Amino acid sequence: MQGNVIHVDKLYKMMYTDNYETIKKYLEYTVIDKTENYSTSANLIPFIPLHQAIEARNIDIIKSIITVDNVNQPGHDDTYPIHIICKEPNMLAISYMLRSINQCSVFNTLVKIKDMFNYRNVEIAKIILTNRYKNIQDIDLKYIDKKSKDDIIEITKLLFSYGADINMVDRHGNSPLHYATENPDQRLTRLLLSKGANPNILNKTNKSPLYYSIESDNPDITMLLIDKFIFNNTDPILSHAIKHYRKPILHALIENGASINARDKYGNTPLHYAVSYCKDIDVIKLLLERGVDVNAKSYIRNLTPLHSSYLKSPRVLKLLLQYGADINSLDSYSLTPLTSVVLQYLCIECGRIVVSHICCLKRIKPDIENSLGFIDNIDAITSNKRLNQIRLKCEDELNRMASIKITNTYSFDVFVLCDNITLLCKLVNNSIIDDILINSFNIYKGIILKNIYRSRKRLYLIENTLYVLNNTFKPNYMWNRLPVELQNYIMEYIDDASLKVMHEYEKHKLKY
């Protein structure tokens, strides 16, 4: 201090270290010097005393200088008081103060503590700066953490009582809620929402507070925001959650309106990120079951999710193909998902899945042989010794299945090439099937057994539901007057889940 002048840096440090009376005296009888020095030149600290007091969580000083006129006053960096209290403490400025008193080793410890307690460490900094500790391990971290959070709530309520604008945005377009969810602080978030904070405000990078809560990995805060968030079909929030692998909140996002087909600026959908980032089969299955576009192409290179998967996981590959992923789709470089990977590094199981699928496609859709993608895939397969051997085995198995007649119209290959469950149900109990050595079809054995099992399971459901219905209704009831063929025909249009519900419900009624 020179005469009646105090530099802004010194005043800032006093907010952390000095008592109320000393700071008050300086504020009343001195002029603040705002010339640049080692810290202010880097815009590390605020110039306005109220802003400094809020950063230091100095409640007594805040109470003595806050007014309705300065509660919404922006600082030199266009930051408002309500933003400061919602932000994490100014650890960079604190580090300068610690280094100035040769406390570098203590600062390193403080950084570790900061990571433990989600950046709520102003009280710990005060203890260190005022030398009120003998050993850093002696500090009651839980008590300090609680006090820091309590102070934040008290200061925030004080700002609101003087008219702080809950939805004021700073130069980055961030609202107080953006910062509260980024930290994160559940109590503070609840308080802001209760005071009317708008969770739908987008900052200059087009991110809402919900984006930051997802990044900070606090499901409780995220659920608070989801409940009040207004979703739209173009918001790629689901992709954001998948990129950060926030599996617990995905169901909530979808149920509350997050679009499963929304594209980000690169044209990627949630499925693109699910197969390339988290690679969690449950997440991928969830998206596919909800109707995500399995063949959506990105804006960059026209990549489908199958391209983005790089054919690395047999389970992912099988699931994508099961839901209609196009193995013959071409990207901007005229590469298919198969030709875009280095074939020598393609795992044996993935190679078998791809080749067996392509061989089936040729029989299901004969016209596909004229498509460029199919031609390129066949060329790649035949030019690779390992894949071509698989192709020859596939062709042999399909030819042998085609030679086994189940009826005058259908051959055994129907259990590989057909996905019509109604048709399979009509064929599955044919005695010829029981005589077939399914183990002789090494490549297609899994598909055959799966289709036989699911068709017999459905047939069992239909037959049992019919039995229960026929024994539930009175003889003169309309249902019992229908021909058996018509009853079966009606059952064909009811899905498995509904059949199961009907069966269990009527069985329960019969029991009682």
Swiss-Prot record:
- Extent of the ANK repeats: 45-73, 77-106, 136-168, 172-201, 205-236, 238-262, 266-296, 301-329
Q: Does the keyword ATP-binding apply?
A: no
Q: Which domain of life is it from?
A: Viruses
Q: Which SUPFAM superfamilies match?
A: Ankyrin repeat
State the Gene3D superfamilies in the record.
Ankyrin repeat-containing domain (1.25.40.20)
Keyword Signal in the entry? The reply is: no
Q: Provide the alphabetized UniProt keywords.
A: ANK repeat, Repeat
**Record protein name field:** Putative ankyrin repeat protein FPV233
Identify the taxonomic lineage of the organism of origin.
Viruses, Varidnaviria, Bamfordvirae, Nucleocytoviricota, Pokkesviricetes
